[in-house]
Swiss-Prot record:
Top-level taxon in the UniProt lineage: Bacteria
Annotated protein name in UniProt: Invasion protein IagB
Keyword Chloroplast: no
Pfam families recorded: SLT
Similarity-based family: Belongs to the IagB/IpgF/P19 family.
Signal peptide: 1-19
Keywords: Signal, Virulence
InterPro entries: Lysozyme-like_dom_sf, Transglycosylase_SLT_dom_1
Gene: iagB
Amino acid sequence: MHYFFIIVIWLLSINTAWADCWLQAEKMFNIESELLYAIAQQESAMKPGAIGHNRDGSTDLGLMQINSFHMKRLKKMGISEKQLLQDPCISVIVGASILSDMMKIYGFSWEAVGAYNAGTSPKRSDIRKRYAKKIWENYRKLKEMSAEEKNKRLSIAVNK
Protein backbone atom coordinates (compact mmCIF):
# COMPACT_ATOMS: atom_id res chain seq x y z
CA MET A 1 0.00 0.00 0.00
CA HIS A 2 2.91 2.35 0.73
CA TYR A 3 4.12 2.08 -2.86
CA PHE A 4 0.63 2.83 -4.10
CA PHE A 5 0.63 6.28 -2.50
CA ILE A 6 4.15 7.02 -3.71
CA ILE A 7 2.88 6.32 -7.21
CA VAL A 8 -0.20 8.50 -6.58
CA ILE A 9 1.92 11.45 -5.44
CA TRP A 10 4.16 10.99 -8.48
CA LEU A 11 1.17 10.89 -10.81
CA LEU A 12 -0.25 14.03 -9.27
CA SER A 13 3.07 15.85 -9.55
CA ILE A 14 3.26 15.45 -13.31
CA ASN A 15 1.58 18.11 -15.39
CA THR A 16 -1.85 16.53 -15.63
CA ALA A 17 -5.10 18.46 -15.92
CA TRP A 18 -7.26 18.27 -12.79
CA ALA A 19 -10.14 16.90 -14.82
CA ASP A 20 -8.05 13.78 -15.34
CA CYS A 21 -8.21 12.92 -11.62
CA TRP A 22 -11.46 11.05 -12.02
CA LEU A 23 -10.07 9.09 -14.96
CA GLN A 24 -6.79 8.37 -13.14
CA ALA A 25 -8.75 6.95 -10.21
CA GLU A 26 -10.91 4.95 -12.60
CA LYS A 27 -7.85 3.39 -14.24
CA MET A 28 -5.96 2.78 -10.99
CA PHE A 29 -8.83 1.03 -9.21
CA ASN A 30 -11.09 -0.13 -12.04
CA ILE A 31 -13.99 1.89 -10.61
CA GLU A 32 -16.07 4.04 -12.97
CA SER A 33 -15.41 7.76 -12.66
CA GLU A 34 -19.17 8.33 -12.67
CA LEU A 35 -19.54 6.19 -9.56
CA LEU A 36 -16.79 8.13 -7.78
CA TYR A 37 -18.41 11.40 -8.85
CA ALA A 38 -21.81 10.18 -7.59
CA ILE A 39 -20.22 9.46 -4.21
CA ALA A 40 -18.59 12.91 -4.10
CA GLN A 41 -21.97 14.51 -4.89
CA GLN A 42 -23.54 12.74 -1.93
CA GLU A 43 -20.62 13.12 0.45
CA SER A 44 -19.68 16.79 0.02
CA ALA A 45 -22.08 18.28 -2.54
CA MET A 46 -18.91 18.69 -4.65
CA LYS A 47 -17.22 21.00 -2.11
CA PRO A 48 -13.50 20.15 -1.97
CA GLY A 49 -12.98 21.89 1.38
CA ALA A 50 -15.97 20.29 3.11
CA ILE A 51 -15.58 19.17 6.71
CA GLY A 52 -18.14 16.91 8.36
CA HIS A 53 -18.33 16.18 12.08
CA ASN A 54 -19.76 12.82 13.12
CA ARG A 55 -21.53 11.71 16.30
CA ASP A 56 -18.72 9.29 17.08
CA GLY A 57 -16.21 12.17 17.24
CA SER A 58 -14.60 11.44 13.87
CA THR A 59 -14.30 13.99 11.09
CA ASP A 60 -14.87 13.65 7.34
CA LEU A 61 -12.56 15.67 5.10
CA GLY A 62 -12.60 16.98 1.55
CA LEU A 63 -14.43 16.26 -1.66
CA MET A 64 -14.78 12.53 -0.93
CA GLN A 65 -15.28 13.09 2.84
CA ILE A 66 -12.40 10.85 3.92
CA ASN A 67 -13.02 9.81 7.53
CA SER A 68 -10.35 10.69 10.09
CA PHE A 69 -10.23 6.97 10.94
CA HIS A 70 -7.97 6.63 7.87
CA MET A 71 -5.56 9.45 8.81
CA LYS A 72 -3.04 7.37 10.73
CA ARG A 73 -2.46 5.19 7.66
CA LEU A 74 -2.58 8.14 5.25
CA LYS A 75 -0.06 10.18 7.27
CA LYS A 76 2.41 7.29 7.07
CA MET A 77 2.06 7.60 3.31
CA GLY A 78 2.63 11.34 3.27
CA ILE A 79 -0.99 12.46 2.93
CA SER A 80 -2.21 15.12 5.36
CA GLU A 81 -5.62 16.45 6.36
CA LYS A 82 -4.65 19.71 4.67
CA GLN A 83 -4.04 17.91 1.37
CA LEU A 84 -7.42 16.16 1.56
CA LEU A 85 -9.07 19.55 2.03
CA GLN A 86 -7.06 21.51 -0.51
CA ASP A 87 -6.32 18.99 -3.25
CA PRO A 88 -9.47 17.43 -4.71
CA CYS A 89 -7.40 15.08 -6.85
CA ILE A 90 -5.81 13.47 -3.79
CA SER A 91 -9.25 13.20 -2.20
CA VAL A 92 -10.61 11.41 -5.28
CA ILE A 93 -7.68 8.96 -5.38
CA VAL A 94 -7.90 8.22 -1.65
CA GLY A 95 -11.69 7.84 -1.89
CA ALA A 96 -11.28 5.41 -4.76
CA SER A 97 -8.75 3.40 -2.74
CA ILE A 98 -11.19 3.17 0.18
CA LEU A 99 -14.03 2.07 -2.12
CA SER A 100 -11.67 -0.48 -3.66
CA ASP A 101 -10.97 -1.84 -0.16
CA MET A 102 -14.72 -2.20 0.42
CA MET A 103 -15.04 -4.03 -2.90
CA LYS A 104 -12.42 -6.52 -1.72
CA ILE A 105 -14.77 -7.33 1.15
CA TYR A 106 -18.18 -7.20 -0.60
CA GLY A 107 -17.25 -7.65 -4.24
CA PHE A 108 -18.22 -5.14 -6.90
CA SER A 109 -21.64 -4.45 -5.38
CA TRP A 110 -23.90 -1.78 -3.99
CA GLU A 111 -23.16 -3.22 -0.55
CA ALA A 112 -19.53 -2.16 -1.08
CA VAL A 113 -20.70 1.32 -2.10
CA GLY A 114 -22.80 1.52 1.07
CA ALA A 115 -19.80 0.42 3.14
CA TYR A 116 -17.83 3.41 1.80
CA ASN A 117 -20.01 5.55 4.03
CA ALA A 118 -21.42 3.23 6.69
CA GLY A 119 -18.55 0.83 7.27
CA THR A 120 -18.63 -2.93 7.54
CA SER A 121 -20.47 -3.60 10.81
CA PRO A 122 -23.34 -6.08 10.34
CA LYS A 123 -25.45 -3.72 12.48
CA ARG A 124 -25.17 -1.01 9.79
CA SER A 125 -26.60 -3.04 6.90
CA ASP A 126 -29.73 -0.87 6.60
CA ILE A 127 -27.62 2.31 6.58
CA ARG A 128 -25.44 0.84 3.82
CA LYS A 129 -28.54 0.06 1.75
CA ARG A 130 -29.99 3.58 2.17
CA TYR A 131 -26.68 5.19 1.27
CA ALA A 132 -26.21 2.94 -1.77
CA LYS A 133 -29.69 3.88 -3.01
CA LYS A 134 -28.74 7.58 -2.90
CA ILE A 135 -25.54 6.89 -4.80
CA TRP A 136 -27.46 4.82 -7.36
CA GLU A 137 -29.75 7.80 -8.04
CA ASN A 138 -26.78 10.15 -8.54
CA TYR A 139 -25.00 7.55 -10.69
CA ARG A 140 -28.07 6.86 -12.84
CA LYS A 141 -28.46 10.59 -13.59
CA LEU A 142 -24.80 10.84 -14.57
CA LYS A 143 -25.05 7.84 -16.89
CA GLU A 144 -27.99 9.51 -18.66
CA MET A 145 -26.00 12.70 -19.40
CA SER A 146 -24.26 13.37 -22.66
CA ALA A 147 -20.50 12.85 -22.71
CA GLU A 148 -19.96 16.61 -23.11
CA GLU A 149 -22.08 17.50 -20.06
CA LYS A 150 -20.46 14.73 -18.01
CA ASN A 151 -16.93 15.94 -18.87
CA LYS A 152 -17.91 19.50 -17.99
CA ARG A 153 -19.15 18.41 -14.55
CA LEU A 154 -16.09 16.30 -13.84
CA SER A 155 -13.83 19.19 -14.79
CA ILE A 156 -15.67 21.74 -12.65
CA ALA A 157 -15.65 19.46 -9.61
CA VAL A 158 -11.88 19.36 -9.23
CA ASN A 159 -11.26 22.96 -10.22
CA LYS A 160 -13.48 24.55 -7.54
